[in-house]
C-alpha cells in the first residue's frame, strides 16, 4: 500500500476530530441538531486551519442516511463516500481555476436537478474570492433563492474580496489560527499512534514554525520524519528549519545579558557558518 501523507491520513472526519474552532463547531452542531439549516455558509480563515475539512464534514452531516445530525454515523454509504471523496452530491469547485462567468453558469445549470443519492446537493466552492465580478453576479440570484435541496459552502482566505451582496446571503464563520499548544498536542497524538520515536523539543519547534496552520505543521512533520529516517529529533528538525541549536541560542542570550561583545561576535560568526534562517532565529530570541 502506498504511503499516505499525514495531513490526509489524519484529516478529521467528524466535528469531534477537529482541533480548535470550538465557537464554529458549537454553532454548526446546534443548527444541525435543531434542523435550523441555512442555504449558504462561508468559512474564512488562513490556510490550513480546517475550512475545507469542515465543509466536507458539514456535507456528511447533511447527507448521513441516519438523518441530519451533528454526529453522522460514519458507516452508511453516504458517509463513506464523502470520506473517500466520491460522493456525487458533494460538488467541489476550485474557484481559482474556474474564475470565468461561463464556468459559473455551467455549474449553476445543474442546481435545479435533485440530488442523485443524497438528501442535499452540496456545492463546496474553495477560494471563492477568486471568482470574477461576473461570476459573483451570476451566482447571486441562485444564492438568494436556491432550491430546497441545495446548500452552498464557500471557503476563502480573503473574505474582503467577496462582494457585500454575497456576504449578506451567507452565514459567516471565521476560523482562528491554532495555538502552538493545540498543534503540539495533535502532533504528539499522531506520533504516538504512528509509533514514531520522537523527542518533545522537536514537536515544539514544528508547532511554533507552523504559524497556526495544522496542515503546515503536518507537512513539516512529514519532512522532518523523512529527514530523520523515520524518527523525529530536535537536531534534525533544527537543521531542516534552519534554526540554531539550544547551546548556541543560550550562549547568544548569555553574552547579551553579560554585555560581552567579543563572545557575542564569536557566537554570531559560528552561527553564520550554519546558514541559519535569521527570521526564525529572531523569533526564538523573542
Stretch-by-stretch model annotation:
Residues 84-88, 103-106, 119, 151, ...:
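Extended, largely alpha-helical regulatory/partner-binding modules appended to the mid-to-C-terminal parts
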Residues 1-172, 182:
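P-loop/Walker A NTP-binding region and its immediately flanking N-terminal helices
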